[in-house]
Amino acid sequence: EGLTVGPNIERMGIRAASNCEVIYENVRVPKENLLGKEGQGYKIAMTALGGGRIGIGAQSVGIAQGAIDETLKYVKERKQGGKPIGKYQNTQFKLAECQTKVDAARLMVWRAATEKDNHGNYAPYAAMCKYFASDVANEVTRQCVQLFGGYGYCREYPVERAMRDAKITEIYEGTNEAMKMIISGSMKV
């Protein structure tokens, strides 16, 4: 009683899951149903965000790697000037740069996850991996769309969806600007 779920809100990306407003009006939670101790909700929520940020880092790596994988298939098939566009140095260099950044992001995700598993102060590592990996996902998906040319802008091709899906990773579980505040705070700036 007192709980209302609003209508689904259409989004630019990550459209497989519903997104709706949840409204609480005069909701009472019995003491036996409390998670943690009374007054500790904010602290618990902030702790959970750290693990979520590692998940967003991993999601970002997956989006970027998927875009690269699709682009690799495409550049082997698409021909220009009588040869596959994957044979051109510009294409090779763009893909090499993208893969290098994705692998660096993957290592940052692993580092943050390891720190969390070892019960260390993983908050700055979670912030770094989320910030870096989401930035990489957005850059890599843009490059992949570019390599697809006009096709990359069409819903028929998966890199278009990857580019839309990548954007939210810079926003949820804390914006990348907030991640920079956490990182710089851990540096005692």
Stretches found by the model and what they are:
Residues 14, 120, 124-189:
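Alpha-helix capping/hinge segments and adjacent helical runs
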Residues 48, 67-74, 111, 143, ...:
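Generic, well-ordered alpha-helical scaffold segments in large soluble proteins
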Residues 72-86, 99-132, 145-148:
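C-terminal helix-coil-helix/basic helical segment that borders enzyme active sites and/or dimer interfaces
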